Amino acid sequence: MRILIFGGTGFVGAHYARHLLEARPVAQVVLCDKAPLDESRYAPVLVQALRDPRCSFRQLDLRQRIPDDLAEGGVDLIANFAAVHREPGHEAWEYFETNLLGADNVCEFADRIGCKTILFTSSISPYGPSELERDEKSLPVPSTPYGASKLAAEKIHLGWHRGGDDRRLLIVRPGVVFGPGEGGNVTRMIRFLRKGLFVYLGNRGVRKSGIYVKSLSRMFEWGLERLGDPSFCNIRPGAAFFNASFDPPPSVEDYVKAIREVGEFKRPVFNIPFKLIYAISHLFMGIGGIHPVRMRKLVRPNLILPSFLKHLDYDWKWDLRSAMADWKCEKPEDWA
């Protein structure tokens, strides 16, 4: 089996590649991305796994046509994880340029070479902001360029799927993905809690859908294995999608409690009114990642439920606390 991972040296791509190499009898995994793997970012165990002779790197820009020679040896699965996603951080057109052109080029390439299976990671962003719980049956109403571009990219992949009855498509909408080497919001939360700098911004009970990166890799495999089952395919025969999150979505306080317990952080956590922090973010916008949009995201719930997984009695393996413990065990420097 030969697998191409677009966005292969990114956070999700690197962890999925490791999962494939350790759990599947694959002949080759090709990491396709704009830059090679930044080994300093990841745990030694992941870096060592990706040094497997079955794993190789191919530099390319997914906004351009994918060359034919990438298909030499055949392609059994294409995983499309490539995206511009940091929000804020880019102009509106940049999300659409990368996320739509990338989807177009991946689907055109799959059509050209005869690959029958695509795995695509979307996002919960297409659902848009709401105080209400939503799941796979809810209407997406994206409110940001990123969310809109991801929803449009889903439709492009669905258009590819309609091109043949033997095609298989799995679309996964993850919440916040965290774990070893993430370097994002949860990593910052760990760092601030360790230093005693973390404060609640009136958001103690705000729920944030999220998933451990290793859980996400297991979900990919679980879903791909079931695409031949008509009862599993909730879009049409051969195509399915689901939300990827813990059930129920953890609150900010749940994240804090799990991190403090695993990290053995004893410093107290205080609560500061959001209006005060929001005003300060305008004064110091752009310094150290401070931005009013990010401040608003901290107090805005994303109650996206994994109802599809729950209905099928999916085994998450890790809960929030055990995920944090596994992360600390694998990459303790993220916690030091």
Features from the language model and the residues they span:
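Conserved beta-loop-beta element that borders a ligand/cofactor-binding pocket
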Residues: 155-180
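N-terminal Rossmann NAD(P)H-binding glycine-rich loop of SDR-like oxidoreductase domains
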Residues: 3-23
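Amphipathic terminal alpha-helices
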Residues: 311, 315-336
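Glycine-rich NAD(P)-binding loop of the Rossmann-fold in SDR/ketoreductase-type enzymes
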Residues: 94-105, 140, 144, 148-151, ...
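NAD(P)H-binding glycine-rich loop region in Rossmannoid oxidoreductase-like domains
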Residues: 56-98
